[in-house]
Amino acid sequence: SGTTDFYRRIITSEASASTLSLENFXHRVTESINMYEKCFKNETMRKCVYDRSLSLLSGVRLRIGLYWIYLQDWFSVFPKENFYIIKTEDYAKCLKCTFKKVYRFLGLPQLNRTNEAFMESIPKANTRRFKDTKMGKMWKETYELLEKFYQPHNERLVK
């Protein structure tokens, strides 16, 4: 899910890796959500999402999961039919399948077996490092906070 993907990305962030604990992560998430919700009450969502200072102050990169705002900006410049949206979990599940669909969408010739084999040999990027897995899964309470925060944004994304 988006929340799990967010956790993976925050854990792999170099700034976080050495100082993060489950308790620290839960605290940072709570404070960040409060900061963004306060901003959303006083400013436009777009301003809050693009506010680099807010992002740096919050300590947790919540804005990276607010995809619909970024897509809305892209759609205001380019036609929607020029976009092919890929879910991270689909990409992770089957890289080759995803690229076949992208090639088809772009009207490119399908991959040959050599290129398919090469794609399957590429190591996965942005995965949790071994030392970071020692921290374990995020707390259920933290997960629920993030799910609650992202839910309305994910609903807008689906529209």
UniProtKB/Swiss-Prot annotation:
> Might you report a single GO cellular component term?
Golgi membrane
Family per similarity comment = Belongs to the sulfotransferase 1 family.
Biological processes per GO annotation? hexose biosynthetic process
Cofactor dependence is on:
a divalent metal cation; glutathione
Query: Quick one: which gene encodes this?
Result: GALNAC4S6ST
Name the chemical reaction catalysed here: dermatan 4'-sulfate + n 3'-phosphoadenylyl sulfate = dermatan 4',6'-bissulfate + n adenosine 3',5'-bisphosphate + n H(+); chondroitin 4'-sulfate + n 3'-phosphoadenylyl sulfate = chondroitin 4',6'-bissulfate + n adenosine 3',5'-bisphosphate + n H(+)
Q: Which residues lie on this side of the membrane: Lumenal?
A: 1-159
Query: What protein is this chain from?
Result: Carbohydrate sulfotransferase 15
Residues with attached carbohydrate:
N42, N112
Q: Where in the cell is it found?
A: Golgi apparatus membrane
What species is given as this protein's source? Nototodarus sloanii
Q: Which UniProt keywords apply?
A: Glycoprotein, Golgi apparatus, Membrane, Transferase
- What are this entry's molecular-function GO terms? N-acetylgalactosamine 4-sulfate 6-O-sulfotransferase activity
Q: Cite any additional comment in the entry.
A: In contrast to the human protein, it does not transfer sulfate to the unique non-reducing terminal sequence GalNAc(4SO4)-GlcA(2SO4)-GalNAc(6SO4).
Q: Does the keyword Membrane apply?
A: yes
